[in-house]
């Protein structure tokens, strides 16, 4: 399993609207897997693979092929610089959903036109030694956090400007069968969009459908790149690839866990944005059973993902979500199980040749 690629994807900074570094990495990885690639006006990378006959040769039929679109968003939650004050403190505005309880004492990377600068993020206020009990027990709002990059104020003001972006700065780690990193939401999907097609390509299996993999932008702020990409592609089938919750940890009732690590990929039934097509659910389930690929059915009470955009584009499409359970989501210690990741890759690669 190509974990090195997953690490590189996760460690590459790219917040909503500034995914270009992630896109450039993906463009290098997908060479030879697709017949056409282009970048749309929203910055999404649209990759087309035409139908294939025996031994992987491009097959030209007399009828228009079924178009299957895989949607994999590139952006991670992060921040934009909103102000640099006269003391050199950097203030930020979130791009995506943060829980302020997870922002204390974090190392960050401030990405500017003048280079990337390491910094630390903390809330304003007194340290524990001199703070009152009330101050210690109060969780600050996100807007109270600032960044210190350790440079004189005049240099900070010359170097960092409003609109520069900020990501968490932590390396990806392997821990047994787990991978821990920032940005697994949703570089997991980027990895799957590459590796599932790589597995399909190396298998030499024929597929009658046209496969479009869209590495989309700005999902974390409203599925924006997926909406425009889906409208342009107008797929017959949309597969939203994403992470989902794995709350199989202390403090959460078992019935609320959503997924459990090590039990396979998630066959996504519904969330707050769309309901998966029943026939597609049955088809993926049949493929998983045939190939003995572990899976678990999942329902997420809220939230959304790019599959919704494909389902609602133009005249509409049949859509489904394929997801990977992730612990500690939207933190710098997001955790997946590589067995679940491999299962998601395998089921996508096995499903595509079944589409007429």
Region spans (language model):
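N-terminal hydrophobic/helix-forming segments and targeting peptides
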Residues: 1-356
């Amino acid at each position: 399993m190509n974990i090195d690629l997953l690490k590189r994807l996760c460690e590459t900074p790219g917040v909503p609207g500034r995914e270009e570094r992630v896109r450039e990495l993906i463009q290098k990885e997908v060479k030879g897997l697709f017949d056409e690639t282009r970048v749309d006006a929203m910055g999404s990378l649209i990759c087309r693979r035409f139908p294939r006959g025996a031994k992987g040769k491009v097959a030209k039929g007399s009828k228009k092929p079924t178009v299957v679109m895989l949607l994999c968003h590139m952006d991670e939650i992060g921040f934009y610089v909103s102000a640099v004050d006269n003391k050199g403190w950097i203030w930020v505005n979130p791009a995506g959903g943060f829980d302020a309880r997870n922002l204390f004492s974090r190392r960050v990377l401030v990405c500017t036109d003048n280079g990337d600068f390491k910094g630390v993020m903390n809330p304003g206020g007194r340290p524990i030694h001199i703070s009152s009990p009330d101050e210690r027990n109060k969780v600050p709002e996100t807007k109270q956090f600032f960044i210190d990059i350790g440079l004189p104020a005049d240099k900070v003001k010359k170097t960092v400007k409003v609109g520069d972006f900020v990501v968490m700065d932590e390396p990806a780690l392997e821990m047994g069968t787990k991978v821990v990193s920032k940005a697994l939401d949703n570089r997991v999907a980027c990895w799957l969009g590459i590796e599932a097609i790589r597995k399909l390509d190396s298998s030499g299996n024929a597929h009658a459908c046209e496969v479009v993999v869209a590495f989309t932008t700005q999902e974390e702020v409203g599925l924006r790149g997926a909406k425009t990409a889906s409208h342009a592609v107008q797929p017959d089938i949309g597969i939203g690839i994403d992470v989902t919750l794995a709350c199989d940890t202390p403090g959460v009732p078992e019935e609320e866990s959503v997924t459990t690590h090590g039990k396979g990929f998630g066959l996504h039934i519904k969330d707050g944005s769309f309901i998966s097509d029943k026939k597609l659910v049955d088809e993926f389930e049949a493929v998983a059973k045939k190939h003995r690929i572990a899976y678990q059915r999942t329902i997420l009470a809220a939230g959304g993902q790019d599959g919704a955009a494909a389902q609602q584009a133009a005249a509409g499409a049949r859509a489904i979500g394929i997801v990977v359970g992730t612990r500690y989501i939207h933190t710098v210690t997001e955790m997946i199980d590589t067995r679940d990741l491999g299962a998601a890759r395998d089921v996508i690669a096995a499903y595509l040749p079944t589409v007429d």
